[in-house]
Amino acid sequence: MDQNIWEYDDFIFKGDELKGMTQKGKDKVKLEGKTDLVIPELTPDGLPLKKIGDNAFYRRGLTSVVIPNTVESIGYDAFGVCKLKEVKLPEALVNIEGFAFYRNKLTKVEFGNKVKRLEPSSFAMNELAEIAFPETLEYIGASAFYKNNFETISFPKSVTKIDMYAFRKNNIHKVEVANSIDLHKFAFEPFTAVERF
């Protein structure tokens, strides 16, 4: 992956947020076929990049992305409807907004150790079969992992709520869920045997 092909004027920045791509950046992806994205760690003003904005790379056809470790928040639909196969999320990341990685081709997601909330549909319609949730995770939103390839799943003690359809359209036949978790009755498929402990 050639980091040097990406320049500041490929992106739109506002303060410490990356809002999206300029026409020059879009052309690099669409016309030149540059689909391996390396996001800069610093803004043009020298600030550490903290946020990737809503819809920043929506439908951009990206096949891979390197997200700097300074990023704390990934916005709504930021990487929605791309072609990402795997993603390593930054250590600083706390918030993953709704639809952030919706409808990609993800088979691998690596979390940092600060993520607390996975908002609705954040990873819906991917190809995930396994995942290791961080020990900081508290909330798994509605349809967060709708239509993936899970057959088994386990949750850290930190999780307090799993919302409606979070794991619908997967192939999980049996799952253990702690009594301390507020589990929506439609979180899993009707055939999933849920054991509370």
Please tell me what each predicted stretch does:
Residues 3-19, 28-51, 60-73, 82-95, ...:
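Structural signature of tandem-repeat unit edges
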